[in-house]
Amino acid sequence: PLSEYEGPGRANAGRQVFVFGDTFIGRVDPATGARRDFDMVYNTLAYLDGGQPDAERIQFVWGKNGSRQLRSPQVGKDAVFLPSTRQAQGAGTCWYWLQDGLALADHMYLMPMLVRRDPAGPPGFQFADFGVCLLKIPIAGNGLDLARHAQIDAPFFHCDDARKLYFGAAFMPNTSAAGA
């Protein structure tokens, strides 16, 4: 919620933000369920006014800075957030998979995984995660000021021969404003 309140009972009074990783944007054949004329975008957002599912009260956001424009025939290039951190530089084609986030004071913070192409992966899974970043997005008016977001490499990913460790998923604010 943009209001910061994470406890029960107030969702109907505010605006919620949903974050998505891979998203298909396009049309679906109603008879077959097959996707037609679509683009796959690596990260998108949605705003929902109130706390109940309602197609009239949800707005999906994609494209650079939330422009809602599909501007590239390349898969994934129409994401809201395109990696620009030091860790992303030189990594080849990479993207963010949005994970968890929270609103705190006048910013929303997201902890996306940094992912790149990996041709050695099995069919359909030619990607590998290689980092975690922090996105800091100003809250302005009734939404996010996506054009003014900041990206920071976060030291919350560790990989060795035995395992991968990620931090930054399923975190919640422990503040009175959040209902704690």
Indicate residue ranges for each PLM-predicted region.
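Carbohydrate-active catalytic/glycan-binding domains of CAZyme proteins
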Residues: 1-180
